[in-house]
Curated annotation (Swiss-Prot):
Residue numbers binding S-adenosyl-L-methionine: R112, S113, A114, N467, H468, Y527
Its job: Protein-lysine N-methyltransferase. Monomethylates PRMT5, modulating its transcriptional activity. May also act as a histone methyltransferase. Plays a critical role in cardiac development. Acts as a key epigenetic regulator of gene expression during cardiac development via its dual activities as a methyltransferase and negative regulator of HDAC1.
Gene Ontology molecular function, alphabetical: histone deacetylase activity; histone deacetylase binding; histone H3K4 methyltransferase activity; zinc ion binding
Binding site for Zn(2+) 1: C246, C249, C268, C272
Consequence of gene loss (knockout): Mutants generated by CRISPR-Cas9-mediated gene editing exhibit severe cardiac malformations, including defects in left-right patterning and looping and hypoplastic ventricles.
Keyword S-adenosyl-L-methionine among UniProt keywords: yes
GO CC terms, sorted: cytoplasm; nucleus
Main subcellular location: nucleus
Family: Belongs to the class V-like SAM-binding methyltransferase superfamily.
Coiled-coil regions, chain positions: none
Organism, scientific name: Danio rerio
UniProt cross-references to SUPFAM superfamilies, sorted A to Z: HIT/MYND zinc finger-like, SET domain, TPR-like
Descriptive protein name: Protein-lysine N-methyltransferase SMYD4
Binding annotation for Zn(2+) 2: C259, C262, H281, C285
Length: 753
């Protein structure tokens, strides 16, 4: 939920509508962010704070012993049927809802330790045993914990012997060491020009797959999935991102440590818990429900300001006010890290690397936001600022720290709210979705589906400098948690900072060339609308609406020229004539057979209706598969396959989805050869849609290698692995799970053949 909840939006819209015309006009003319914030501050009253409090009741983050007990009991039910992963998730939610140092907390920890033990996670089990005892686990039950503790220690001692693997080989992400990030590779430089702003060029040839940039998120905020269930204070069955990922470093974990004050925030270990508390959570915690109500962007904007502190913000304000715009050169100028920043009023012609100034200097696009949108953001931040004043000011924002003097909110601290408003405006164009591949767990199928989902929203100071293309020459991947980087892939140059661990976010983006880049070429990133997934008009509409620019990338120019009134009819990709099977030509009103002797025509509406019908059949079949009703699903998929073949060629995206679903179904029944044959058919459609060097094709080849491996066809699996590895290596870290599994399969098969 990036934006505020609808109830709060409606309240602010009503407040906007009630303004007198002269007030509306006065606000609409304001372009200075401080003035916009102060105007919003002047309009709020205690009732606004009360209304937000009432709205946020449905997002309650209060501890609840009753809810903790419910989750523990649900965990017990999962434990009894040996569904240990689900048991751990239930126990973790119980841990988060239980009060500090209570029997309920100790019981949740103890039960979770048992579920972790049966998954072979012995180190994590020992940690939970320690936590349970520290929370006051009943003395008459401690024999069970001591027995489990001894068993864990024995297993870990066995694993220390050579050639004896064990499953608990990883440290908590919090315990891992970190290399500095936020740097460009050798041969990459930041430039500025009046038409492109800041952008990046490669100064030497870069082959596809080479890392060109690594950047660390300044801050990130998880996107909650179960936000509307939190207010019921009742245990719910499903688990969202907030239940699976550390709220500081975003790493996946099973054994979370909770915030001692609220039921929402949880961390992969005590280190992340402390770092988050020190940097922002001790001030976010009392207004946690309000932050869930105002949405991820408002929450992230506040978090950036809390982390930066008054000194950093004042430095940003002073530097921008001390300079006037003198930059008039139209030719690109190379920028050096921390170089002369006196050329522009807003520092948009400077390169600040990974520092806070890298965030502060991003354009807020004040004039491009509609007056109503500016009003919503201003009132929202003014009310949150008012809520924060219910507690002590953040340490980094206190005007004085004289011993014996009680800290209080000073008038000049309003810059906290104004700067948060600045960042909220910036995030409209500069927020970056953090994605992860998640396996769907609700299904009882032997073979489960996976999909890429958004788990968080972050802001990256260096990544934000990349310009957009609908057909980019880079791909990005994310790393979460504080992990070592033994590969040291980058020859570090500009933008290299050494941060103490406590100030780091643990969330890193790696940008790789997805195509061969030649010296002087601009590094381009896709903001979301991609040519392979969206028509040009829709892409341009979305980019103008959210990012305030008319895209003129090469892909858009090519697509627009093909669709111009002067352009000739062109072949409709993936479409064929229902009468003769020849390719269809698309035109303004519909489609015509390309074979002159046939000339059959079909309207666009008819085509859309057919495609929607195919999609409904596929959705129904997938639903049946998830219920393990495989025969019914197969009947529907075969019907959809027959109907689709009458009008769609093998390269149409729907044919790829259909073939993938059939492959999953046959894999569920152990018919590996049939599954592989259908998955091969999906490769044609995926390559046509995404390209022969795409990550999508690489992942599909990875699945094909798995099917051949499971079907004991080692020769076929070994023939697929090299191509899958090459494509995945273009887009992913060498440590990604897919590449590691490919190596394990290859090693196993080579030992057998």
């Amino acid at each position: 939920m990036d934006l505020p909840c609808q109830d709060w939006v409606c309240h602010v819209e009503q407040k906007w509508a009630e303004l007198r015309s002269e007030e509306t006009e006065r606000f609409s003319l304001l372009t200075d962010i401080d003035a916009i914030f102060n105007y919003g501050l002047s309009l709020i009253c205690p009732e606004d704070l009360n209304i937000l409090s009432r709205i946020s009741e449905k997002f309650s983050v209060k501890k609840s012993p009753e809810t903790a007990s419910e989750f523990r009991q649900q965990g017990n039910l999962s434990f009894k049927v040996k569904d240990y992963p689900a048991a751990v998730l239930h126990y973790s939610k119980g841990v988060c809802h239980a009060d500090k140092n209570t029997d309920e907390l100790s019981l949740c920890y103890a039960n979770r330790s048992a579920a972790l033990f049966y998954q072979g996670l012995y180190q994590a089990c020992l940690e939970d045993i320690r936590r349970s005892l520290e929370a006051g686990y009943p003395s008459h039950l401690q024999d069970k914990l001591q027995t489990r503790q001894t068993a864990c220690q024995n297993q870990l001692r066995k694993a220390e012997k050579p050639n004896i693997p064990h499953t608990d080989h990883q440290l908590s992400p919090c315990q891992k060491t970190v290399n500095s990030t936020g740097h460009l590779s050798d041969g990459v430089s930041v430039y500025f020009s009046s038409d492109k702003g800041r952008h990046m060029l490669v100064m030497e040839n870069k082959p596809a797959g080479e890392v060109v940039l690594e950047d660390e998120a300044y801050c990130s905020v998880l996107i909650p999935a179960n936000i509307f269930n939190t207010g019921t204070n009742k245990a719910v069955e499903t688990f969202g991102t907030e239940d699976r990922h550390c709220h500081h470093c975003l790493s996946q974990s099973l054994s979370f440590v909770p915030c001692p004050k609220c039921s929402y925030a949880r961390y992969c270990g005590e280190s992340c818990q402390k770092d988050a508390w020190d940097q922002w959570h001790q001030w976010e915690c009392p207004v946690g429900a309000d932050l869930l109500a105002i949405g991820v962007l408002g929450h992230l904007a506040l978090r950036v300001v809390l982390k930066a502190g008054q000194t950093e913000v004042q430095m940003g304000i002073k530097n921008t006010k001390d300079h006037v715009t003198t930059y008039k050169n139209d030719s690109p100028v190379q920028l050096s890290l921390g170089g002369d920043c006196g050329k522009s009023l807003d520092h948009t012609d400077c390169f600040h690397g990974s520092s806070y100034m890298g965030i502060y200097s991003l354009l807020p696009h004040v004039a491009q936001h509609s007056p109503a949108s500016r009003f919503l953001m201003a009132i929202t931040m003014a009310v949150i600022y008012g809520k924060l004043q219910g507690g002590p000011p953040p340490n980094k924002w206190m005007s004085f720290k004289d011993e014996g003097v009680k800290a209080s909110w000073q008038p000049e601290m309003s810059m906290l709210g104004a700067t948060a408003l600045r960042h909220m405006m910036q995030l409209r164009c500069n927020a970056q979705a953090i994605t992860a591949v998640r396996v769907k767990e609700e299904s009882g199928m032997a073979v489960q589906s996976s999909s890429e989902i958004r788990i968080a929203t972050a802001i990256f100071p260096v990544l934000s400098l990349l310009n957009h293309s609908c057909s980019p020459n880079t791909s990005i991947s994310f790393t979460t948690g504080f992990q070592p980087d033994p590969h040291n892939q980058l020859g570090c140059s500009e933008g290299h900072f050494d941060h103490p661990k406590g100030s780091r976010s643990g969330v890193t983006v790696t940008v790789r060339a997805s195509k061969d880049l030649t010296a002087g070429q601009e590094i381009l990133h896709c903001y979301g609308p991609h040519r392979s997934r969206m028509e040009v008009k829709e892409r341009q509409r979305l980019l103008l609406e959210q990012y305030f620019f008319q895209c003129v990338c090469q892909a858009c120019q090519r697509d627009l020229s093909e669709g111009s009134p002067n352009a000739k009819e062109h072949t409709a990709p993936g479409m064929k004539c229902v009468k003769c099977g020849k390719p269809l030509q698309s035109h303004t009103d519909g489609y015509t057979c390309s074979w002159s002797s046939c000339g059959h025509q079909i309207s666009s509406a008819d085509v859309q209706n057919r495609l929607q019908g195919f999609q409904l059949l596929l959705d129904e079949a997938v639903h049946l598969m998830e219920q393990d009703r495989l025969n019914e699903a197969l009947h529907i998929l075969q019907s959809a396959f027959s109907q689709a073949n009458s009008i769609l060629t093998e390269t149409h995206p729907f044919q790829g989805e259909l073939a993938d679903a059939l492959a999953r179904l046959y894999a569920s029944t152990g018919e590996w050869s049939l599954a592989a044959s259908h998955l091969k058919r999906s490769l044609v459609a995926i390559q046509a849609q995404f390209g022969e060097d795409s990550i999508e094709l690489g992942r599909q080849l990875f699945k094909l290698a798995q099917l051949h491996f499971n079907g004991r066809d080692g020769v076929a699996s070994l023939s697929v692995i090299p191509r899958a590895r090459r494509l995945l290596s273009l887009h992913c870290s060498p440590r990604c799970e897919e590449l590691q599994e490919l190596s394990e399969m290859e090693h196993c098969l080579q030992g057998l053949l």
